[in-house]
């Protein structure tokens, strides 16, 4: 059975989703309110995680352990390293990496997560296709791109760092 977890770091990022869902239960875990219900006849759990990778990871683990979600959508605002993206455009993640992971002193590549043997985390192809189709159907005037998402607990403003990440 498909059950989708929808995460937003800030209330502003999830309030619209919550307003369209039929909520059957609200469960509080680790200070976060998980809204369980349906959205367009699909089982969903919507939650505001708080800002940062640690909060997102904690939230994701609760979604997996307590709610047994099969898929996760992380929604919200973000900065852009891509000059072709404007405010209001949509970027669908083809892959993701931690831009501030650095254990090169132990022989790993920049961004590589120890003992995982990789630094990129690939998106599910079916979810990519469905997300792009949904975006185009709902609002065909908004630019939609598929590309890399990088995550880090810092803001990147240095041009050389930006170029390395994209």
What residue spans do the PLM features occupy?
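Glycine-rich phosphate- or other oxyanion-binding loops that anchor nucleotides, phosphorylated ligands
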Residues: 2-3, 27-166
């Amino acid at each position: 059975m498909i059950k989708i977890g929808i995460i937003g770091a800030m209330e502003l990022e999830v309030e619209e989703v919550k307003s369209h869902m039929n909520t059957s239960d609200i469960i509080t875990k680790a200070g976060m309110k998980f809204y369980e219900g349906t959205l367009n006849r699909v089982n969903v759990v919507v939650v505001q995680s708080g800002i940062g990778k640690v909060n997102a990871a904690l939230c994701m683990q609760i979604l997996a352990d307590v709610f047994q979600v099969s898929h996760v959508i992380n929604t919200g605002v973000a900065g852009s390293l891509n000059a072709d993206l404007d405010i209001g455009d949509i970027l669908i993640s083809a892959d993701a990496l931690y831009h501030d992971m650095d254990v090169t002193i132990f022989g790993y590549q920049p961004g590589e997560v120890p003992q995982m043997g990789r630094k990129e985390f690939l998106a599910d192809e079916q979810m990519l296709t469905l997300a792009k189709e949904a975006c185009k159907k709902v609002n065909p005037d908004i630019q939609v791109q598929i590309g890399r998402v990088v995550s880090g607990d810092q803001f990147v403003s240095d041009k050389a760092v930006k170029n390395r990440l994209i």
